[in-house]
Regions:
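Lumenal/extracellular ectodomains and adaptor appendage modules
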Residues: 1-236
Length: 236
């Protein structure tokens, strides 16, 4: 679409498609296959694409029970299930996330003498765009942030520890960038901005240690969802 139509025409086409899809949903809501609908909601929740917030406390508690609240850890509860947060946000004002591969690997947990548990985590971010594709990017897709090249996948990367935990021994290989330490309501995290041009990769490796209060609860990962699965499926 973006490669074949100018911006003005593509905007109109997308508006028409969205309107037709919405009319179809509302007009055929009585014919919906409930099983498929529930499956779609479950997949969206599992991938972190479906999140919700309710102003009413009772409703918000119900949302939390379903696991789609996407809230950061409770800073006052170090005994909660430990979660490693790996988040990134596009700062290039673009649609280049289609070319972003994000792979996070969590190593085997090592129990420490003080009751904490340490995990070695590796986050690999890659702009899989080829040089040929970079040379043909339409304006609607290319980066438009100040001082950014057209193929620049500029990302803010944030790595969160669980409540009562910490991050240490952090290294960056490949495309270099700085990660600064900070806290959010007492929860430690590292954050920085990386520029990935066509074909470039950065690999972040660090040790995440959970709290002693979390005991033997396994560490889980919460990561910003990407287009990776949809892109690979479309090209299969």
């Amino acid at each position: 679409m973006y490669w074949n139509y100018p911006v003005e025409e593509s905007d109109g086409i997308f508006a028409a498609v969205a309107s037709a899809a919405f009319d179809k949903i509302l007009g055929g809501i009585g014919d919906v296959d409930v099983t498929k609908l529930v499956g779609a909601f479950e997949r969206g929740a599992e991938e972190g694409r479906l999140i919700a917030w309710m102003r009413n406390d009772d409703e918000q508690n119900a949302i939390k029970e379903t696991g789609i609240d996407a809230s950061l850890p409770d800073p006052d509860d170090p005994s909660a299930d430990p979660v490693a947060g790996v988040y990134f946000n596009n700062l290039s004002f673009s649609k280049l996330d289609w070319y972003l591969n994000a792979d996070t690997q969590i190593g085997q947990g090592i129990k420490n003498g003080d009751g904490t548990c340490s995990y070695r985590i590796t986050v690999t971010l890659t702009n899989i765009m080829t040089q040929e594709e970079a040379g043909k990017l339409p304006d609607y897709v290319a980066a438009s942030a100040p001082d950014a090249a057209r193929d620049d996948e500029r990302l803010n990367v944030s790595l969160f520890a669980p409540t009562g935990g910490n991050i240490s021994d952090l290294t960056v290989e490949g495309t270099q960038f700085g990660l600064g330490a900070a806290t959010w309501h007492g929860i430690p995290f590292y954050s920085g901005t990386v520029d990935l041009h066509a074909g470039e990769t950065t690999t972040i490796t660090y040790t995440l240690t959970t709290s002693a209060e979390a005991g033997d609860k396994p560490l889980t990962l919460r990561q910003t969802p990407t287009c990776q699965a949809a892109r690979d499926s479309a090209s299969a």
